[in-house]
């Protein structure tokens, strides 16, 4: 693997798009902090769940979500809730990134967003962001420089693609299981707890370990 700084392989922009509705602006949907925080990937299927707001044409041009990008949480009440990444899996026509988040656009000749998303969610990256956050007490934040200086380990593009596809396939299966569980009929309580447990899917956890970057 080759070692880079994030700024050497991607651009980083900080969104300041708020949730207000202004008559002079265009209607959009916002991908907000919680959308980034709770999703491995942002897919077209989530479009209708994004809140409606407005934004200027300049904001739309800068923060419109495009396939291959990565969004990152930038500000939060605890240092452990910042630096959480999500992969933008589809192109969107009217969904832009909301404030308290950063938008990372990789140079795809060097790095793929699906791999960056996995790397930024690694234990090593989480420790980097937690230790580099500024603030204390009520609010923690990541500066643009801190995000840009993040050490990144890159394998060849083909290997990045395989790693990204592995995580994407797992995320899809998890989403399918969630949808199945959501649509299951409420169990008859008279059947007892055992019947409820039979309907549950086991939790599968695994980890890819990246060598130390620093």
What are these regions (language model features)?
Residues 53-56, 102-108, 148-154, 168, ...:
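Short, well-ordered beta-strand elements within core beta-sheets of diverse protein domains
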Residues 32-34, 52-54, 59-121:
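A short beta-sheet element
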Residues 114-146:
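Short, positively charged
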Residues 94-102, 134-164:
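A short glycine-rich beta-alpha junction/loop motif
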Residues 7-23, 34-70, 214:
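Sequence-specific dsDNA recognition surfaces
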């Amino acid at each position: 693997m080759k070692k880079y700084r994030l700024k050497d392989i991607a651009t980083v922009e900080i969104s300041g798009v708020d949730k207000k509705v202004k008559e002079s602006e265009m209607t959009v949907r916002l991908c907000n902090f919680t959308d980034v925080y709770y999703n491995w990937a942002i897919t077209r299927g989530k479009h209708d769940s994004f809140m409606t707001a407005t934004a200027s044409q300049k904001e739309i041009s800068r923060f419109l979500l495009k396939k291959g990008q990565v969004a990152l949480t930038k500000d939060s009440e605890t240092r452990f809730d910042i630096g959480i990444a999500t992969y933008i899996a589809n192109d969107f026509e009217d969904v832009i990134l909301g404030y308290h988040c950063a938008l990372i656009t990789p140079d795809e000749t060097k790095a793929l967003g699906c791999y960056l998303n996995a790397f930024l969610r690694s234990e090593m990256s989480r420790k980097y962001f937690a230790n580099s956050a500024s603030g204390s007490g009520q609010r923690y934040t990541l500066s643009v420089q801190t995000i840009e200086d993040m050490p990144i380990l890159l394998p060849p593009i083909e290997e990045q693609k395989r790693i990204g596809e592995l995580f994407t396939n797992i995320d899809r299966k998890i989403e399918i299981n969630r949808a199945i569980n959501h649509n299951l009929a409420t169990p008859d309580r008279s059947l007892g707890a055992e019947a409820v447990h039979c309907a549950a899917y086991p939790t599968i956890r695994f980890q890819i370990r990246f060598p130390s970057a620093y």
